[in-house]
Amino acid sequence: MNRRQFCVSAAAAGVAATAGAAASESALQTDGAAAASKPVDGAPNLFTPLKLRGVTLRNRIAMSPMCQYSSEDGFANEWHVAHHAARAMGGVGLLLAEATGVTPQGRITPNCLGIWKDEHIPALRKVTEFVSAHGGVPGIQLAHAGVKASRHRPFHPTPNAFVPLEEGGWMPVGPTAKRYGQDGPVPHELTAEEIRAVTAAFAAAATRSLAAGFRVVELHFAHGYLGHSFLSPLMNERKDEYGGSFDSRVRFLLESVRAVRAVLPEETPLLVRLSCTDWVEGGWTLDDSVEVSRRLAKEGVDLIDCSSGGASRQAQIPVGPSYQAPLAERIRREAGIATGAVGLITDPAQADAIIAEGKADLVLLGRELLRDPHWPHRAWTALKPASPPPIAREYAWALPETRR
């Protein structure tokens, strides 16, 4: 699977219960920055806690949002519970659910998760309850696929091809009536009123997320999906208040952040995933990401999840181990906001060094956690072999290495 394939009104009582649980955990931190944590009992840097507002992660390891393409009508099912459960028991600190459509048309495929209606809440709550019961923090990535919507899932006979309208597909939308790639219809260019409706959908989805038990919310503004397509000059050719200048191109992002932050309790962290550079001349740049991250910090965003690419097939991406960590490091240093590093982070020493050297506050693992849900346990053993790894008691009793 390539990286693009990885994407991936509440009851008042449910929201209040979620907010109360988060508030009781720890003192409120309101400056939007991650709290510095000293090593606990000589733990490796990767295993120090991370405090974001009123939520404390048990370590610096996060599961990157990865589409499972296993939903019907947006509903979570047993697969999603098992996917998250395995990694929560494996020791992951923050588990981010896949790109979850804030509208039916906001899904990448007909088989992606959704949170556009209240009926989605109970099934998602099964996921969050299990994660929370096993020491993980459940988070969700809210998304709209934009011009990349209505695609077949990657294990379909015609992977990633456009799903025709007569087969249950839908019309993609974007900032401009401009197609990404060669197949599928020309997207519908959103009106200003329709853009504001999507912003409202993000806020409504955030409210449902709280009712479902998610304690961290991330907005997906990367990889050529709707949010990123407004930011990138390669995809946004509008001439109104949502296109043209830098200030106009970041308007949709800032308005969405304000709308979501307004419905979240003060103790709930808000993350934003950015494609920090398009890797194409004339596109969105790292300088742009630094500047918008400064603005996001002032709007109450707590961490920038630093990815890249997705706006152009001509991108020259220097793929290699930790290749996006320098993006996270610069934004962390110059924008004064916590960051997450993602992309080909596979080795425990590599991940630990990213934290130790101040390149990022969090490391997000994708494929490596698909290969090994217990990667955190393996990482602990590699980094601190003389001490028993923090393994769930249901497993620990049977493993000699936990009784040293």
Name each model-derived stretch.
Residues T18-E25:
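C-terminal segment of classical bacterial N-terminal signal peptides
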Residues C7-V15, L28-R404:
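Flavin-dependent oxidoreductase catalytic cores
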Residues M1-Q5:
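Twin-arginine (Tat) signal peptide motif
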